[in-house]
């Protein structure tokens, strides 16, 4: 099993130590049975020391068994911690394009459901290991008592285990399907939570989402979980009843066939009773391990970036003068839409506005410009030199951005991840009219319950605090009131230029196009620059041009 192989590779010596403890626990368990057989059944030892010896063995068995199980459980939790941390780091290192293809619902399912299933498996793993080791050790002890009886008992037990595995295989099959259904349910949950306002307004749509999206997926989940539980419980009960049958078989072989005396039969029965709980626990634990393997395979199918422990420090381009996109093209995976070839040269300190209709490719161009999407052909050049695709972090370090689907972080960070310049923060808090709204504590924003427009202002503050050369603003002013929108174009953008910022703003505010150094337009994935009469016409009626 690939999951256990990975544990072995990463924690070889701790794993060996845990196995040694498990072997010691099994040996003590068998030794206790031998002690009962030799000192309490066969010879009926009347010495007063027999009880303290027996109690001492019990306490030692308890301590070693508990120690081995705790050690294995702790090892499992260390592995899960490492697995989750590596998964998060791989998400952070994976191209945005790939993350968008996967979708947040499936990734959240991986971080919650899949990792939880792996955790449960490692909690139950001690039961599986203990059951296997005790079974092997007990078989060796029973062989010494009666080889013929062990052979028949082993055949009986083999049938028991085979039947259990057949049933468990069906559990595995349904668990694999169940995991796919969970992804659908997470998408349904996201629809209900993210679309709560629209669904509250439109009860017919809410009914459709509930009856046509959620209910079929929930019913499919219910079907497979019931089937999985049915086969799991069948496996446990099959094993339970067959173990009791083995005890009857032992006494039949001893008394009817005369293969052993009553003391040996009693020892056999005692050993089987001792094995009953660990063996049944092992059978019960096996589905969790199989489910964990399904979850582990699901995590691997995400095809995220390889794990790298370090966060490479990007190298800055402090004195760049021109940024050029030369014959850059990009097409989405389904080939439903493409942009390019794009040819664009940006000079340091320029203020550029990009206009275009919905679906014209504005946001895609923004993703290409910032290095979040990789061009499928063409190249990006800084001062005439191609930007290496092997180190996109160096290029991305030029940019701060405020996207339309803004996410607010509560920590203000400056260059190189250090605390933000307090004078800069104070200045822009005042400029953004947020000084009375935001509560800061040690560079952390305490209150983030803000309106959408206010969140955009905080996002701009976060971007400016990073003190990077180029700032991308994707329809930033769309959520501002008319007064502050005018303030943004007439006051804030010139202030940013005075700071040396190069500004690339996606905008539909035709009244303010006059403030741009250059006006660009995206139309059906093609970029053009508007000059002269075209620019004047766009300024008079941007809506008509971008419809």
UniProtKB/Swiss-Prot annotation:
Keywords: Antibiotic resistance, ATP-binding, Cell inner membrane, Cell membrane, Membrane, Nucleotide-binding, Transmembrane, Transmembrane helix, Transport. Mediates resistance to the antibacterial peptide microcin J25, when expressed from a multicopy vector. Functions as an efflux pump for microcin J25, with the help of the outer membrane channel TolC. This is ABC transporter ATP-binding/permease protein YojI. The keyword Heme does not apply. The chain crosses the membrane at residues 16-36, 47-67, 125-145, 149-169, 240-260, 270-290. SMART domains: AAA. Residues 15-291 form the ABC transmembrane type-1 domain. It comes from Escherichia coli (strain K12). It holds the Pfam family ABC_tran.
């Amino acid at each position: 099993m690939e999951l256990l192989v990975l544990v072995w590779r990463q924690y070889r010596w701790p794993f060996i130590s845990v196995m040694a403890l498990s072997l010691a626990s099994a040996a003590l368990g068998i030794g206790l049975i031998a002690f009962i057989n030799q000192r309490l059944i066969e010879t009926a030892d009347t010495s007063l020391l027999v009880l303290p010896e027996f109690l001492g063995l019990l306490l030692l068995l308890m301590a070693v068994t508990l120690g081995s199980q705790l050690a294995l459980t702790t090892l499992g939790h260390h592995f899960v911690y490492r697995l989750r941390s590596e998964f998060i780091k791989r998400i952070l290192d994976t191209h945005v394009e790939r993350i968008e293809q996967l979708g947040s619902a499936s990734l959240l399912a991986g971080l919650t459901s899949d990792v939880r299933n792996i955790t449960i498996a490692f909690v139950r793993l001690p039961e599986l290991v203990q059951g296997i080791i005790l079974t092997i050790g007990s078989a060796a002890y029973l062989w010494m008592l009666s080889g013929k009886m062990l052979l028949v008992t082993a055949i009986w037990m083999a049938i028991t285990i085979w039947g259990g595995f057949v049933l468990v295989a069906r559990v595995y099959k349904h668990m694999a399907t169940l995991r796919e259904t969970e992804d659908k349910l997470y998408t349904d949950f996201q629809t209900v939570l993210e679309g709560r306002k629209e669904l509250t307004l439109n009860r017919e749509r809410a009914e459709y989402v509930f009856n046509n999206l959620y209910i079929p997926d929930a019913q499919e989940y219910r079907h497979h979980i019931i089937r999985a539980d049915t086969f799991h419980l069948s496996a446990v009960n099959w094993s339970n009843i067959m173990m009791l049958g083995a005890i009857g078989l032992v006494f039949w072989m001893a008394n009817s066939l005369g293969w052993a005396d009553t003391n040996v039969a009693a020892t056999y029965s005692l050993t089987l009773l001792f094995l009953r709980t660990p063996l049944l626990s092992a059978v019960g634990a096996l589905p969790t391990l199989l489910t964990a393997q399904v979850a582990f395979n699901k995590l691997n199918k995400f095809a995220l970036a390889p794990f790298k422990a370090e966060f490479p420090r990007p190298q800055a381009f402090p004195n760049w003068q021109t940024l050029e996109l030369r014959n850059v093209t990009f097409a989405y995976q389904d080939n439903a839409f493409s942009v390019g070839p794009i040819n664009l040269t940006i000079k340091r300190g320029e203020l550029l506005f990009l206009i275009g209709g919905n679906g014209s490719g504005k946001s895609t161009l923004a993703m290409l410009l910032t290095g979040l999407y990789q061009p499928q052909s063409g190249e990006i050049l800084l001062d005439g030199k191609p930007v290496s695709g092997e180190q996109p972090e160096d290029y991305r370090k030029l940019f701060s951005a405020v996207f339309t689907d803004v996410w607010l972080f509560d920590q203000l960070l400056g260059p190189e991840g250090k605390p933000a310049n307090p004078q800069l923060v104070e200045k822009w808090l005042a400029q953004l009219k947020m000084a009375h709204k935001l509560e800061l504590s040690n560079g952390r924003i305490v209150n983030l319950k803000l309106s959408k427009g206010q969140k955009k202002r905080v996002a701009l503050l976060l971007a400016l605090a990073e003190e990077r050369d180029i700032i991308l603003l994707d329809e930033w002013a769309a959520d501002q009131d008319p007064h502050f929108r005018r303030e943004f174009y007439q006051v804030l953008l010139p202030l940013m230029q005075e700071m040396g910022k190069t500004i690339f703003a996606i905008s539909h505010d035709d009244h303010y196009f006059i403030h741009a150094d250059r006006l660009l337009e995206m139309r059906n994935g093609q970029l053009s620059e508007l000059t002269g009469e075209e620019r004047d016409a766009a300024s008079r009626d941007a809506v008509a041009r971008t419809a």
